[in-house]
Amino acid sequence: MVLFIILAILVVILIAIGVLFYMRSNKRNLIEKTEERKNEIEQLPLDDNLRKLTGLNLKGETKTKYDAMKKDNTETTNKYLAPVEEKIQNAEELLEKFKFTAAQTEIDDAHELMDQYEENYQHQVTQVDDIINLHKENEALYEKCKVDYREMKRDVLANRHQFGEAAEPLENEIENYEPKLNEYENLKSEGNYVQAHNHIAALEDQIKNLKSYMDEIPELIRETQKELPGQFQDLKYGCRDLKVEGYDLDHVKVDGTIQSLKTELSFVEPMISRLELDEANNKLENINDKLDEMYDLIEYEVKAKNEVEETKDIITDDLFKAKDMNYTLQTEIEYVRENYYINESDAQSVRQFENEIQSLISVYDDILKETSKSAVRYSEVQDNLQYLEDHVSVINKEQDKLQNHLIQLREDEAEAEDNLLRVQSKKEEVYRRLLASNLTSVPERFIIMKNEIDNEVREVNEQFSERPIHVKQLKDKVAKIVIQMNTFEDEANDVLVNAVYAEKLIQYGNRYRKDHHHVDKSLNEAERLFKNNRYKRAIEIAEEALESVEPGITKHIEEQVIKE
C-alpha cells in the first residue's frame, strides 16, 4: 500500500516536472519571437528616412526641423530600442528559474517599447514626407505664379484697348508681383519653407483675384460704354413710338429717369480705372434694376391695353344682360305679386339694382370716352373695367337668384297642391281599410285624427283660393299635414296588424279551452279587450296563455300574419 502511494507521488512529481518544462518551452518560443521582432525593428531605416531631407536646403526652418528630428532619433533609440535587449535577457534568466509570470512581464515590456519605437518611426516618416511635399507644393505654386505673372503682363500690353483707363493700374499691380516672387526665392534660400509656403500661397491668391478682375473689366467697360447707352436710346425711342400709338406713359418718367441713370453711369468708368470693381458692379446693378422697373411699367401698359380690348366686350354683354334682366324682374314682380306674396325687400333690391346698373353704364360710357383720347393710361382703364366687371357680376348673380325665386313660387304652389291631393286620397284609403277590417269599431282616436286632417285640408284649400298667396306659409302648413297623414297611416297600420294578430291568437287558442281552464279564462279576457279596441293588451294575454301550453307558437303565428 505504501509502495503504491510512493509510486503515485512520483508520477505526480514527474507530471508536474513535465508540465513545467513544457511551459518553459512555450515561453522560450515567445522570447525567440520577441528577439526576431527586435531584429526587424532594428532594420527600420530611421536615419535613412531622415537623410531624405539632406537634399533640401538645410538652413533656417528646414535646418532647425532636421536637427530636432535627428535628436529625436537618438532619444527614441536610447529610450525605446536599447532597453529591449536587456528585457529579453531578463526574461531568459527568469525562465531558467521557472518564474513564468515575471518572464511574461519582461516580454510584454519589451513589446511595449518596440511598439513605441515603431510609432515614433511612423511619425518621423510622416513629418519627412510632409516637409518634402510642402517643398514640392511651394515650387509648383511658384512656377504657376511666374507663368501667370508673365501672361498677365503680356495680356495687358497686347490688349491695352480692352482695359481702357484700368490698364495702367493693372500694370502697376502686376509689377508689384515681381519683388514678391523674389521674396519667395529669398525665403527658400534661407530654408524657411513654412514662411515661403505662406508667402507664395498668399501671392497665388492675389494673382488669381487680379486675373478674375482682368477677365471682368472688358465686360464691365463694354456694358458701360455700349450696352447701357444703347438700352437708354432704345427705351427712349420705344416710349416715343408707344406715345404715338396712344399710350400715356407720363407716370414712367422716362426722360428724367434716363438722364439720372446716365449721370450714375458716368461714375462707373472711374471706379473701373481704380479697380474698384465691387463698387462698379453695385452701381451697374442699381442702374439695371431701375431700367427693369421702367420696362415692367411699360410692359404692364401694353398688356393692359390688350386686356382692355378683351374686357370691353365682356362688360358690354354683362351690362346688357343686367339691364334686360332688371326690366324682366320688375315686370315679373308686378305680375307675380297679384297672385303671390312678395317680400318688399326683394322689390326694393330690384329697384336698387336698376339704379346701380344705370350708374355703372354711365361709368362705362366715361371709360369708353377715356379710351378714345389721344393718350390713354391703359393700366388705370383696366383697373376701372375690373371694378365694373366685379360689380356687374355680383348684380347678375343676385338678379338670377331673384328670378329663380319667382319661378320657384309657382313650382312650390303646384307642389303644395299636389301634396294636398295625395293627402286627401291617402286619408280616405286608410279610413276605408279601417272600416273594412275585422275591428269591432273604428277607434275614436282615428276618427279624431281624420277630422283634424280634414279641418287642416279645408283651411289650406281656403288659403289656395285667396290672393296673394303666402307660398312659404302655405308650403309649411302642407308639410305639417303630410306629417299628420303619415302618423295617421302608420298608427292605422299598427292597429290593423295587431287586430289580425290578436284574432289569430284567439282562434288558435280555442283548441285548448276545453282541456286548459287557465287558457280558456285568458282567452275570454283577450276577447273582452279585443271588443274594447285594446288590441295590444289582448295580444299580451293571448300570447302568455298559448306559450304556457305550446311554447314558440306565437312567433310562428306572428310570422304568418306579417307575410299576409
UniProtKB/Swiss-Prot annotation:
One of its GO terms (cellular component) is septin ring. GO terms for biological process: division septum assembly; septin ring assembly. Pfam families: EzrA (PF06160). Residues 84-126, 165-223, 271-303, 350-435 form a coiled coil. It is a single-pass membrane protein. The keyword Membrane applies. Belongs to the EzrA family. HAMAP family: EzrA. This is Septation ring formation regulator EzrA. The lineage of its organism: Bacteria, Bacillati, Bacillota, Bacilli, Bacillales. The gene is ezrA.
